[in-house]
Amino acid sequence: VDDGSTNIKLAWVEDGAVKTLISPNSFKPEWSMTLQGLTDATVPASANYEIDGEKYSFDQLSPDAVRTTETRYQYSDVNVVAIHHALMQSGIAPQPVDIVVTLPLGEYLDENDQPNLANIERKKNNVRRTVTVQGRENFTIRKVSVLPESVPAGFDVLKDLNDLESLLIVDIGGTTLD
């Protein structure tokens, strides 16, 4: 899970094939009206979520959408809701899952360029919180691993580099450049 400030990007393996999904971050406080009963669907077409007693809904057009382009988003309710929303959009049946999420380099590393264990643990604790989905089963985050943004993109390339080669990764995100 690349839980960036403007989109959540998912990648998973299903039936031997890598699947991907991009889900925009646009959530407003409070729930939106559902259209249950107006379609043949057995579950509501809404995207209403609750976390720690706070209600949010996915709404790409709302002027009241919560701002996600700040560092505090990484540890916020909306970050967790956005991850769950992306999982719900993936088509994967709700179940316990293990995920890998990211932090911007400035949050992942401390002033000595070492992993900032306090921020990493804060991120893990945030993502493990329970999110309920109105009228539907929800995912349970069983295990969370945290990596610095941009670095996971190079894993496949790094294994094929020799000792004299190097790799530069430029991650142009919605609000950061790593």
Where are these regions (language model features)?
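Basic (Lys/Arg-enriched) interaction patch that binds polyanionic ligands
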Residues: 166-178
